[in-house]
Amino acid sequence: MQERVPLFMLLIANAAIYDAAARGFFRGDLLLEGGRIAEVSRGISARREKLPDSAVLDVGGRTVLPGLVDIHTHGRAGGDFGSADGAMLERMLASYLASGVTTVLPTLASAEPTALREAIRRIGEAAAQESAPSLAGRRAHIAGVHLEGRYLNPAKRGAHAPELLAPLDADELEGFLRAMPGVRHVTAALELDADGSFLRRALSCGATVGLGHSTATYEQAMRAFADGATAVTHLYNALPPLHHRAGGAVCAALLSPDISCELICDGFHIAPEMVRLAATLKRERLVLITDSMEATGCPDGEYRIAGMPVTVKDGKARTHDGAIAGSTLSLLDGVRNYAAFAGVSFGTAVYAATMAPAIEVGLEHEIGSLEPGKRADLLILNADGTPAQVMCGGVFCGSANRGAV
């Protein structure tokens, strides 16, 4: 006898389900209810025979991953989070979802305070609309804002305009974060935080903090970690190089087991052997990011990041003075690249784009793995590793091409 099926119940059957703890896969069934994962079964679920065909989706052994989590991304699909209006934000979020990313932290580069406040207001308005039925399955989830500027070291500014940088002022930061509670993560050059007040204030406001765009010595970085910083923004990039007489922030991060290290695995930002070094030392705290900019998913040409002109050629973005200006990487490609560069399993690489970023920004109890109680964010892959279907909050976006550019 078939059981009465609650509204919004679906059993995904005959799947190769990702196991975050084992960094591997097992054949089983996944029961979803009300936008959440209700049950994960190894083998055939006892519920399978009791449910009507309409409530069972047999995926034919396809791989089912948690939705990917990108916590450092400035934009894609022709839009930048710093300037995008409501319509462009919808286009961008649809493009993220189609690529397999179900959760994003819109990342804002350095700008004047008024411009940052306005960008966060627009992003907040977009996030507030997520419960609208008309948007179900149409876009990735916004989990808060990553504030990458303005508190950076001018000597390691990268593509950030120097006139937009500011000293590390704890009072300014607190006013900023209290007025804009959507900021979840802050990048800062913490060697400029002489008395530690900036870091303490950020933590007291509920943000996580990463060291980045920094000239920090080994000792300065270790002090920042001891005081509460939990991550290093795009390891190796916009930091002093690893040196045998001065390890610097890179060495400090690699030797600190509890510090998350972000990597851009596009084959351009970091040499494969340096990716392998980080993978060997970091394991659970290696976090794949894209640092993507508006040209992602678009042809080569002229673009902008943080108001600065950027030329994209052969998929590589540079400012006119030659600085690397973000990437055009998709996170799923980053997963594949990481596995190839570091010589790790696909399952290990998936962890770095799902559970590890969720841990970095304090979202591991909500997303990042396929466990009961977590949000039903899924990525189902074809045999060739491309997205077959993407689900966000229990709703499929339909064809993986929907919203793509």
Each model region followed by its residue ranges:
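N-terminal metal-binding scaffold of metallo-dependent hydrolase/deaminase domains
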Residues: R4-E49, M391
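Alpha-helical scaffold segments that flank or form the walls of functional sites
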Residues: R62-T63, I71, F81-A140, L164-A179, ...
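Divalent metal-dependent hydrolysis catalytic cores, especially in the metallo-beta-lactamase
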Residues: H74, E90-R122, A140-N153, M180-E191, ...
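His/Asp/Glu-enriched, well-ordered alpha-helical/loop segment
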Residues: G248-C261, A279-L381
